Amino acid sequence: MSMLKWFAALALVSLLAQPCLAADPAPIVGVWKLVSFEREYQAGGEREYPMGKAPTGYILFLPEGRMTVVITGEGRTAPTTDQDRAGLYNTLVAYTGRYRVEGDKWITTLDVSANPAWVGTEQARSFRIDGNRLQEMTAWVARPDNRMARAVITYERAK
């Protein structure tokens, strides 16, 4: 076998031995500021604002593959009772983990979350980028009233 063929074969074997790489995460890498948090119902497209019309938050995607999100609902105030403190949980979304991009989805393996049931799970989100806007869509899930809904969360690239 000629040296050139040997190197070509070695290169091919090396390439095939590499793990499958996910889509390029570069478009979502960075810091994004929350614009809106809506719940959309599948039947009829009705939308509501479970975090209020002016929630606050950020989502960060690092090039190393770590993401973090913190979202708080509109009108949160300092708690004065245990009941107040417990109520704040209903207006908080916070988690972090390792993410990968696969097509139009990012999938995060959570290692920390305000919701302990999410720790160790994979959370998949569909997304699209339009200019400086990032729109995140959760999977459709059945609400307590059995209607199917998802969160549609919009961010803009932070300056």
Describe each region flagged by the PLM.
Residues A9-V13, Q18-K159:
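Lipid interaction determinants
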Residues M1-A8:
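Bacterial N-terminal signal peptides that target proteins for export
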